[in-house]
Amino acid sequence: MTTQTVSGRRYFTKAWLMEQKSLIALLVLIAIVSTLSPNFFTINNLFNILQQTSVNAIMAVGMTLVILTSGIDLSVGSLLALTGAVAASIVGIEVNALVAVAAALALGAAIGAVTGVIVAKGRVQAFIATLVMMLLLRGVTMVYTNGSPVNTGFTENADLFGWFGIGRPLGVPTPVWIMGIVFLAAWYMLHHTRLGRYIYALGGNEAATRLSGINVNKIKIIVYSLCGLLASLAGIIEVARLSSAQPTAGTGYELDAIAAVVLGGTSLAGGKGRIVGTLIGALILGFLNNGLNLLGVSSYYQMIVKAVVILLAVLVDNKKQ
């Protein structure tokens, strides 16, 4: 065996390990927490983790699309709160639950499109544009709800709406089914459609993408609209699970979504990343939160641990770049 062959294999092994670092981290985390807590690796707890992770994971899909285009969206948490409140209020006046879901999804997509227009047409930096939208939407939510929770009520229609949060088709929680469908759809779009190729191209080199004749502004608007749609879907699930919409819901959720994307290996510079990695990143956060809770770790220390994990992920990403 030649020195060149050995060197090539070592390089391949190192590259493979770097590519699978998120999955390896998840498996190591599961092994450690399972050893420390006998109640961790049980069917009920695993379903509980997946159900709690679903909201962040769905939001993280939309965030992945935005970050792949070299953008960011800080407004998703506020958008979740607003669309969730709208859905709850519609269900509360006994309008069909499916109408409430459709209205919330349409509102989320429309607001996301507005954000996209500001970024693409207005040429405002994504950080600034979405920071403004975050504050604006939070204020609108407070005005709409008068700062009070919006309950869905206890009617048959409310029970139908609640299925999106606490239903268990075939014994699996509805949010887990929805999360799986969203990830499969996003994976297919990114790897088997023209839009997916354009998203990667835009994040890789916007100037070259524009010169090749692709409507860059249209792609940005679509991506932010999809991000808004998925944020509203996450809001529907959360409200359906709790039977009420809190005006402060979603606070800090944008950071969790970004963390899941970064932990999954998507580059903050855009153009590089995998939707499967985002799912793994969301699961890492979900398992980490659940494990620390089972071990009785204070919520204050949990924030510190999460911050360290995210920082390490960013440092690894920078080294890879």
From Swiss-Prot:
One Gene Ontology biological process: D-ribose transmembrane transport
Name the record gives this protein: Ribose import permease protein RbsC
Known function: Part of the ABC transporter complex RbsABC involved in ribose import. Probably responsible for the translocation of the substrate across the membrane. (Microbial infection) Probably transports the toxic C-terminal region of CdiA from D.dadantii strain 3937 across the inner membrane to the cytoplasm, where CdiA has a toxic effect. Toxin transport is strain-specific, mutations in this gene do not confer resistance to several other tested CdiA toxins.
Lineage of source species: Bacteria, Pseudomonadati, Pseudomonadota, Gammaproteobacteria, Enterobacterales
InterPro entries hit by this protein: ABC_transp_permease (IPR001851)
PANTHER family given in the database record: ABC TRANSPORTER PERMEASE PROTEIN YPHD-RELATED (PTHR32196:SF21), ABC TRANSPORTER PERMEASE PROTEIN YPHD-RELATED-RELATED (PTHR32196)
Subunit: The complex is composed of an ATP-binding protein (RbsA), two transmembrane proteins (RbsC) and a solute-binding protein (RbsB).
Membrane topology listed for this record: Multi-pass membrane protein
Molecular functions (GO terms): D-ribose transmembrane transporter activity
Domain of life: Bacteria
Deletion consequences: Disruption confers resistance to cellular contact-dependent growth inhibition (CDI) CdiA of D.dadantii strain 3937, but not to several other tested CdiA toxins.
Family: Belongs to the binding-protein-dependent transport system permease family. AraH/RbsC subfamily.
Cytoplasmic side: 1-22, 78-125, 191-220, 317-321
Principal location: membrane
